[in-house]
Amino acid sequence: MDEAVYREMADVQSAHWWYRGRRHILATVIESLKLPKEAAILEAGCGPGGNLPMLAQFGTVSAFEPHDGARDAANAKGAATVLPGTLPDGIPFPQPFALVCAFDVVEHVEDDVGAVRALGAKLAPGGRLLLTVPAHPWLWSEHDVRNHHHRRYSREAFAKVLDAAGLHTDKLTAFNAHLFPIIAGTRLIQNSLGLGARAEEAVPSPAVNSLLEKIFAAEASQVARGGYPTGVSLLAVASAGRPQ
């Protein structure tokens, strides 16, 4: 991603409703996985490290990030060991993990099947892979361009990636469903008018930010228990499947 995108992410990830709401949803899903005590956890492409303190509630966290500035910011949080690394061929940790996470990372990698296969190869026996990606190719916008996405995924396309990577899909659900009509409408209007996506990435006023966070975070129990048929994003939980 561009340097400016990393800086913006570092500036807003602790306060913006989307990051806060997503962390609550992810924490609820992880809690439902019943990981072993002091589980070894890996986050791929951790960026400036906004998820690391949340992950550290569930075990001992390692992470990797290719961008120097983002990696420095992540290490400064003190919640994980963060090393340089890339997907699919540059994971810097030799050991297996009970939980391997990649939150909105796979869409940045040209070889998405190879990336998911490499992450799956780091699973300890009984381990789980937790992934999120942006949904609906028709929602492609300037936001995706600025973030150097290669693609957005339909549910069927993401299921095929997991299968091609040799994994068993335990859960595949949409999320960010409650706000989906508003976000989809905004993206479509922006696209039709040729507008950029900078406004949606800024932190709204405190009242609006709090309201949006509550609406988004309210999905947590439903995502953990079952899921939603459609939304702005997809979440998958997978485990080791057939040998490659």
Model-found features: residue ranges?
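Residues lining the SAM
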Residues: 103-106, 132
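A short glycine-rich, Lys/Arg-flanked "PGG" loop and its adjoining helix->strand segment in the class I
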Residues: 113-128
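Di-metal (Zn2+ and/or Mg2+/Mn2+) metal-binding site signature of metallo-dependent hydrolases
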Residues: 108-112
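Conserved S-adenosyl-L-methionine
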Residues: 167-177
